[in-house]
Amino acid sequence: MIDIKEIREALPHRYPMLLVDRVLEVSEDEIVAIKNVSINEPFFNGHFPEYPVMPGVLIMEALAQTAGVLELSKEENKGKLVFYAGMDKVKFKKQVVPGDQLVMTAKFVKRRGTIAVVEAIAEVDGKLAASGTLTFAIGN
């Protein structure tokens, strides 16, 4: 398990853009993390005031940060940054609303130099909320 202190050491993101609360499981190429979605999230003020829904792009950002924790917690990548390079095959299947716990899984499927490709899913209560293939670059 990786707690919020270690997550903050790995990622440069801070409130309100830090979207990973805790890592539950981690291996060499796979990670499972959670985001507890609260009504106090700033994006709910405008998306949407009468029917708050977590924006899909922020779900994908949370998945990218999850993969980033895995990559940036490795000794050889300490102090580096992870940059989004693309998204493919993104699908949104279930709305994420206040009170939900987003369970995010990212698995590395390909690496070439400083470029990595990740298959990622986000679930709520065991149901698929979003999925996609994320590409990112590791840099200084």
From Swiss-Prot:
Note the InterPro entries from the entry.
Answer: FabA_FabZ, FabZ, HotDog_dom_sf
Q: Biological process GO terms, please?
A: fatty acid biosynthetic process; lipid A biosynthetic process
Record flagged with keyword Oxidoreductase: no
* GO CC term, one of those recorded: cytoplasm
Q: Where are the transmembrane segments?
A: none
Instruction: Report which superkingdom the organism of origin falls in.
Output: Bacteria
Which keywords are on file for this protein?
Cytoplasm, Lipid A biosynthesis, Lipid biosynthesis, Lipid metabolism, Lyase
Q: What is its EC number?
A: 4.2.1.59
Supply one GO molecular-function term.
(3R)-hydroxyacyl-[acyl-carrier-protein] dehydratase activity
Q: What class of enzyme is it?
A: lyase
What is the reaction catalyzed? Answer: a (3R)-hydroxyacyl-[ACP] = a (2E)-enoyl-[ACP] + H2O
Pfam (any one): FabA
From the Swiss-Prot or TrEMBL record, state where the protein is found.
Answer: Cytoplasm
Q: Where is the active site?
A: H47
The record's principal subcellular location, in a coarse class, is cytoplasm
Note the NCBIfam families from the entry.
fabZ, PRK00006.1
Question: PANTHER family annotated for this entry?
Answer: 3-HYDROXYACYL-[ACYL-CARRIER-PROTEIN] DEHYDRATASE (PTHR30272:SF1)
Q: What does this protein do?
A: Involved in unsaturated fatty acids biosynthesis. Catalyzes the dehydration of short chain beta-hydroxyacyl-ACPs and long chain saturated and unsaturated beta-hydroxyacyl-ACPs.
Q: Which family does it belong to?
A: Belongs to the thioester dehydratase family. FabZ subfamily.
Supply the HAMAP family for this chain.
FabZ
Q: What is this protein called?
A: 3-hydroxyacyl-[acyl-carrier-protein] dehydratase FabZ
Organism name:
Streptococcus agalactiae serotype V (strain ATCC BAA-611 / 2603 V/R)
